Amino acid sequence: MTESHPDTFCIILLPVPLDRHCNPFFPADLTNHDHACELARLSLAAWRANPERWPEVHERLFSRPVLPPEVAEAAVGQIVGYDELARALEDPWINQILQTGIKDFKQMIFRSGAMPKLVVGDDEVLHGAHRSKEVLLETLERLYRLRD
């Protein structure tokens, strides 16, 4: 959609750790994602240190099994540079972005606990994964009246 309608769509990733250690709004009946708080901080620090390398960091942090924080930090440092990562981890921007994402999550979780969330326009939120890429594209085309 961003390629076929660049003036209509953009993608903004909103980091929200699914872990009550740093996200008090994550539902108590769901299992925390191991190390989500630490990995979210590392991801944001990697973006801050070297945004061009962030996709590689993202893939590494979402690999299985989940990396313990110390191993993840070493892996991210290898990708973006150890000194750059250390400096970025000290940046207050990281906590500001996390708190913004958590605050937005608080508002969205009341409607449905299904993940992921896709915010469309000013007030439409799609909850949960779509059955297929085609179904998602059809939904967006319908919402934005993109069909001829």
Residue ranges and their predicted role:
Residues 1-5, 9, 73-148:
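C-terminal cap of thioredoxin/glutaredoxin-like
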